[in-house]
Regions:
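Periplasmic-binding protein-like
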Residues: 27, 45-112
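Short helix-initiation/N-cap motifs at beta->coil->alpha
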Residues: 20-31, 69
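Phosphate- and divalent-cation-binding pockets in alpha/beta enzyme and binding domains
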Residues: 6-7, 32, 50-51, 85, ...
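Bilobed "Venus flytrap"/periplasmic-binding protein-like clamshell domains
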Residues: 1-25, 45-49
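Surface-exposed patches in mature extracellular/periplasmic domains of secreted proteins
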Residues: 20, 63, 101-105
Length: 112
């Protein structure tokens, strides 16, 4: 199952929910939310912020959450050259402010 389903199921609030539906993708879930077939959707925050930025006033992101997750980048263990290039690119993006601009665009709460 998805991490969202697992996180919701672990939360005591899930006992107050009439039904928890699983979807194969976020687009289908958000379409059902838009048409009123759902009351709420649980998605990764970055996904939710992306959709709310594209549909201003149509969706609302709650400040509550069901926990946090960490993500990583997987590389072949022996690909030291790619690792060095990736590290250098990330360091450069942090140094020149590009990383902060990306974070501001995609991860911060939209103005309401």
């Amino acid at each position: 199952g998805s991490s969202a389903v697992e996180a919701v199921a672990k939360d005591p609030v899930s006992r107050q929910m009439k039904e928890i539906k699983k979807f194969g993708d976020n687009v289908a879930a958000l379409m059902d939310l838009t048409t009123g077939r759902l009351d709420a959707v649980v998605v990764d925050e970055v996904v939710g912020r992306y959709y709310t930025s594209r549909k201003a006033g149509q969706y609302r992101i709650l400040s509550d959450n069901f926990g946090s997750e960490e993500y990583g980048v997987g590389l072949r263990k022996d690909d030291k050259a790619l690792l060095a290039k990736l590290d250098a690119a990330l360091d450069a993006m942090k140094a020149d402010g590009t990383a902060q601009k990306i974070a501001a665009k995609w991860f911060q709460a939209p103005q309401q």
